[in-house]
């Protein structure tokens, strides 16, 4: 009888251990998925903010001659040095230099992308559009522009809509845009 009781007790002990182990495994898997989901959402949100704010700031530097030192919050310094539109704006050769730009309607669309919590590089396809620019030619140039190009020259030229492949890198816990490669120029 004693051996039978021990086997009977061992059977219940084994069932109890397997029950606890299976529940711990399920809880661990659920917690792992929650942590992965949290870090995915955090990375996607940070990348979204960096791209939207960075591309808007880039357009402001090009059109409104804003301070270009703000771009380092969003872009790597090496990219800023290679970006011809930003460099032309800094040098005073922007197509918008003779215009007082008061505002713009900046729009950025992003495709779906996946970033694992441990990833330090992200690739995103974006479409940048600026359908409306609020501004006029500076007073000193108004008569000259109207004489040379007609009345439509009083308003700033349209921004070329583009589709880009953007590569972002995570440096010191912050995402920065490393490169923008033009995929295609889009109709405005």
Predicted regions and their residues:
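Conserved small/polar residues in nucleotide/adenosyl-binding loops
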Residues: 1-6
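Short, Lys/Arg-rich N-terminal segment immediately upstream of the first membrane anchor
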Residues: 7-21
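Acidic, low-complexity intrinsically disordered regions
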Residues: 14, 110-114, 155, 171
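Short low-polarity hydrophobic stretches
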Residues: 19-20, 96, 124
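Hydrophobic membrane-insertion alpha-helices, especially the h-region
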Residues: 22-40
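Core segments of small alpha/beta cavity-forming domains
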Residues: 36-111, 115-116
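Exposed beta-sheet edge and beta->alpha loop/turn motif
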Residues: 120-188
């Amino acid at each position: 009888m004693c051996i039978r009781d021990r086997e009977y007790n061992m059977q219940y002990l084994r069932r109890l251990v397997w029950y606890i182990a299976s529940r711990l495994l399920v809880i661990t898997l659920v917690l792992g998925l929650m942590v992965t989901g949290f870090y995915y959402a955090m990375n996607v949100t940070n990348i979204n903010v960096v791209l939207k704010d960075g591309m808007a700031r880039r357009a402001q530097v090009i059109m409104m001659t804003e301070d270009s030192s703000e771009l380092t919050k969003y872009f790597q310094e090496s990219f800023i040095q290679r970006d011809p539109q930003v460099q032309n704006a800094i040098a005073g050769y922007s197509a918008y230099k003779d215009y007082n730009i008061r505002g713009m309607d900046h729009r950025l669309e992003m495709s779906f992308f996946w970033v694992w919590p441990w990833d330090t590089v992200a690739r995103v396809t974006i479409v940048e559009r600026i359908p409306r620019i609020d501004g006029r030619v500076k007073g000193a140039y108004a008569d000259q522009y109207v004489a040379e190009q007609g009345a439509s020259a009083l308003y700033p030229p349209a921004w070329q809509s583009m589709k880009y492949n953007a590569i972002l890198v995570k440096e010191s816990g912050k995402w920065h845009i490393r490169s923008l490669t033009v995929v295609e120029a889009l109709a405005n």
